[in-house]
Amino acid sequence: MQQPLEQAVAETILQRFESFYSRFLEITQGSKSRFENSDWLGVQLAGRERIRLYDHHVGATTALIKQMMGEHHATQELLKRVKGAFSDLLPRCDNFEVAESFFNSVYRRIFRHRNIRDENLYIHPFRSRGEHPDLSALLRVYRTDLTHLPQTLSQMLGDYSFTLPYEDKQRDIVDIHRHLAENGPQILHEEPFAIELLKEVFYRNKGAYLVGLIRVKGQVFPFILPLLSTGQSIYVDTVIFEPELASIVVGFARAYFMVYAPVPALFVVFLRQIMPHKPDYEIYNAIGCQKHGKTELYRHYQQHLAQSREQFVIAPGIKGMVMSVFTLPSYDVVFKVIKDEFTPPKDVSHEQVRAKYRLVKQHDRVGRMADTQEFTNFEFPLDRISPELLAELKTVAPSALTITSDKLVIKHLYTERKMIPLNLYLDKADEQQTRLALEEYGNAIKQLAAANIFPGDMLFKNFGVTRHGRVVFYDYDEICYMTECNFRQIPPPRYPEDEWSAEPWYSVAPNDIFPEEFATFLLQKPQVREIMMQLHKEMFDANYWKMLQSNIKVGVFEDVYPYRRKKRFKFQRGG
């Protein structure tokens, strides 16, 4: 007897999801070998391939479903029955949370993101794991105290096998023990404790991370050991037990971790314990499930919307030439809409802007570029849109809007973590805050450049300050690869009057960049000039940028750590 069409379609979607996630895990599993072999180019290529997997599989699944439906076509009634059949299949799927998101993506793709009915989507989770799912199979647990910690650490490091030996395991054990004894929570001196470590290693860039927590007397502290490779051996770079630093390590401005997680929801439950203030969607993003992170973000947004009463407003700061940005004051996210026409002198197309955002999604963000999510036909309650914001959107992006009696629907937008624009931060900062922010700003530009990203527009308004005081770039319409730039020094004037001319006395090609000119628009305030020239003088010299380009061209991958240099054991030992 032939299966009902809805049953066949539901089973096909689930099979295609399982095929996608199997390939996702296969790419992830290669991380250990890439780390052991210092295959840093392979790390980048694998990251890009894994990000592209989801859309590829959703597209192929959508095409197959349309073929299966044939003359029946995809009606809302049929898709409602498909969802019912899919829900019946979910109990057999361990990774049902991400499977729901995959179903949503296929449904939206079939209807080209139009005439979407919430009841045919998994707006709310269909299944729940309960508040306290069993995590024991994921963990190694070590019960110890500060006196016996060295023996525990020796066992712990031995439990994680690599083909490379430790450079000096005993030295690393001494460093971890010393650092925890001198700087760790005081309660570790007073009580025995348990260290719970995830069995699976987290890989990102040049690092491998053992990720876990310390549990003592009802309190929980992070316990993260970053491992680095010399090419011949590995070593522990530091120990992280500070909640703020753990949150930065699993940050929204970094490349996604590669961690073998057949059931990512269980990893999220565990990580939530050491980062209770980080929303689930950011944790899903961090472990590479960014498409399900998008689902979780939407659910988080809906929940916040229901619990708040204020209106969406234009975001603080200087208005962008390419984007109109707005936010809900109590919500930690901004919404960015591409304008219909760009403010001169911007000379890019809509498709070029979207291509830049795709580039950022697939590139190593080195902790300095905010992650984004892209939405189509995003709905807002009309009565929650302030009159000023509605007038602004009608003026700058009318083609992106559909307005009904009770809804504002925006055809296309990006979401991004809310930060304080650096220019606004500097306006209110004292001398110490200014110095730290400018140090961060210069470091952000240098680290992006070392990762082959030139920001293009380096004005302070295009950078944000996070709650942890880090400076992150968030305006992508002018970014390009460093290797595409032609850094030049300004030629000397031919005649004295050249310096007073409104036009340059030298030819300028489209990709020509003159770092000396950065000072003109960045260093207008004497205090800023003084600090920048102390900390980042080389940024204004074309030779510095050419040197970075040379490193990139010969395959030098710079070390970028998600913690300050003084946190590294090597630095503490005077190395």
Swiss-Prot record:
Enzyme Commission (EC) number: 2.7.11.5, 3.1.3.-
Single GO term (MF): [isocitrate dehydrogenase (NADP+)] kinase activity
Binding sites annotated in the UniProt record for ATP: 315-321, 336
Keywords of this entry: ATP-binding, Cytoplasm, Glyoxylate bypass, Hydrolase, Kinase, Nucleotide-binding, Protein phosphatase, Serine/threonine-protein kinase, Transferase, Tricarboxylic acid cycle
Pfam families reported for this sequence: AceK_kinase (PF06315), AceK_regulatory (PF20423)
GO biological process, one term: tricarboxylic acid cycle
Compartment list: Cytoplasm
Coiled coil residues, start to end: none
GO CC, one annotated term: cytoplasm
NCBIfam families: PRK02946.1 (NF002804)
Family: Belongs to the AceK family.
Protein name: Isocitrate dehydrogenase kinase/phosphatase
Lineage: Bacteria, Pseudomonadati, Pseudomonadota, Gammaproteobacteria, Aeromonadales
Gene name tied to this protein: aceK
